[in-house]
Amino acid sequence: MTIFAAVTGGFKGAFAVHSWIVLKDRDGKAYDRYDVVGWGAPIRRNAYVPDGYWYSNPPQPVWETTGAEAERLIPKIEAAIAAYPHGKRGAYRLWPGPNSNSFVAYILRKVPEIDAVLPPNAIGRDYIADGAFYHFDPAGDVNLTLYGLLGVSAGLKSGFELHLLGLVAGVDFRRPAVKVPAFGQFGS
């Protein structure tokens, strides 16, 4: 299983990525790609090639795992996808969310065993899809947000981040890097 992100199209591509998740169970014959888009039914399953380009931009893996760990996580991920509260027509909002990045971030919050954080330029990742203003990760991360517009995150997964209008600035201490608004992460 892999979480991908790719630079999005048009003006948005100047400062944002689109993220999605790809699953394949042990006995699966093909990969299943799940992402959210702003037209039609928001949650799409296999509408696009699993590792395909997005608006002519190559995807980058954000996190991946295989084997027993993937087998253990896939049912939890599928349950989180089914429970996503913004999966109905008309629920998508480009900014500040809920959008494609809010969807993948929701899965990461519901399945905290996935040791990943979406890139800083995944606009919408800080919109907490449950409507909450905070989230405490079992690993110790704390996320505080006002609908993804203003917030702060701190912890081992996130490092330290400030969020303003969907943009993120901060530092990652575990994988030494600087998070720069609209550009992403520089470092490891």
Model-predicted regions and their roles:
Residues 92-111, 115-118, 122-127:
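Active-site nucleophilic cysteine motif
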Residues 121-123, 128, 132-140:
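C-terminal charged interaction modules
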